[in-house]
A protein has these predicted regions:
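Short beta-strand elements at the ligand-binding edges of bilobed clamshell
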Residues: 65-67, 121-144, 157-161, 189, ...
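Hinge/cleft segment of the Venus flytrap/periplasmic-binding protein
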Residues: 24, 162, 166, 177-178, ...
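Short, solvent-exposed amphipathic alpha-helices that sit
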Residues: 43-57, 61, 137-141, 165-184, ...
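Flexible loop/hinge segments that line or gate small-molecule binding clefts
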Residues: 97-136, 147, 154, 248-259
Length: 300
């Protein structure tokens, strides 16, 4: 397995190097695609690699990445940068919907097609959307909780960044799924901001107050792991179950944490970078494409 991974890694490196060399003088670039990522984490890295890899199947495609590091103003600046560069197409993963919507609409008004990925904006004024159904993920988590707790127990929720659409939709799906279950009570929530450290710090404080949590649901695996570590510091990790979302493979990520027993379950949240680039190229090359592209999810 190690040698196969090394060979795959070497092949990917050589392909990237070849693409870089062929386009470094700009003469072979047919399309310049800007990618504005809201954050910089392993889930985003996987998506970026998928986009880069898919772009190699097309001649003369230059993909430029910028990350806003969870900061609305940084992302607004990044989008303005790409607009000023007159990119041929813009891919945007919005940090917070309300803050980033005007920037996406500005790009559209300038004639730049925009593919919105993962998180939505507060408008239909974009060219295409690619992402999972976050309401369904929340609902699926809720149904899993009902089954896992046999219809009775206290749960605590760690949400993602409050202004981001996945956080809002996952919460709404969860609450709708639990609405008809009177013996399952959501005893509280904190905003973990999608970050392991922030979730861990807040859950540490929560556990000093709440002594009766049966299951802790965090809206991504990083926050679920942060919550688990906070509980372990207090010697309470065996008192409750931990459930997350993402199911990334690899050391210290969600899939491994389910196998090792740290997480009780996680739900696949597909990155879909290859699909994003395929749709981007369909738009650029005037081929048919769907405006709304929903990626499937599943329980692990």
């Amino acid at each position: 397995n190690t040698s196969v991974n090394m060979k795959n890694g070497l092949l990917y490196f050589l392909l990237c190097l070849a693409a870089l060399v062929s386009s470094c003088d700009g003469t072979n670039t047919r399309y310049h695609i800007g990618v504005s990522q809201c954050s910089d984490d392993e889930w985003r890295h996987k998506m970026n690699k998928e986009m880069q890899r898919e772009a190699l199947f097309y001649d003369g495609v230059q993909v430029e990445f910028r990350t806003a590091k969870d900061n609305n103003q940084y992302q607004i600046n990044d989008i303005n940068y790409f607009i000023d560069r007159k990119v041929d197409l813009l891919i945007v993963a919005p940090n917070e919907a309300a803050a980033i919507t005007p920037s996406v609409e500005k790009a559209i008004k300038k004639g730049i097609p925009v593919v919105v990925v993962d998180r939505k904006i507060l408008s239909d004024n974009y060219t295409a959307f690619v992402g999972a159904d976050n309401y369904k993920i929340g609902s699926d988590v809720g149904h899993y909780i009902v089954s896992r707790l046999n219809g009775k127990g206290n749960i605590f929720e760690v949400t993602g960044l409050q202004g981001s659409t996945p956080a809002m939709e996952r919460h709404r799906g969860l609450m709708d799924a639990l609405a008809g279950i009177p013996n399952i009570k959501r005893v509280g929530s904190v905003d973990g901001g999608w970050l392991q450290s922030q979730a861990g710090e807040k859950v540490d404080s929560v556990l000093r107050v709440h002594k009766d949590i049966d299951l802790l649901f965090a809206q991504n695996d990083r926050m679920a792991i942060g919550a688990y570590l906070a509980a372990r510091q207090q010697g309470r990790e065996k008192e409750m179950l931990f459930v997350g979302v993402d199911a990334l493979p690899g050391k210290d990520y969600g899939l491994e944490q389910v196998i090792s027993g740290v997480l009780d379950a996680t739900f696949i949240y597909p990155t879909g970078g290859d699909k994003v680039m395929q749709i981007a190229m369909n738009i650029l090359e005037k081929r048919p494409f769907e405006k709304e592209n929903i990626l499937s999810t599943a329980l692990v």
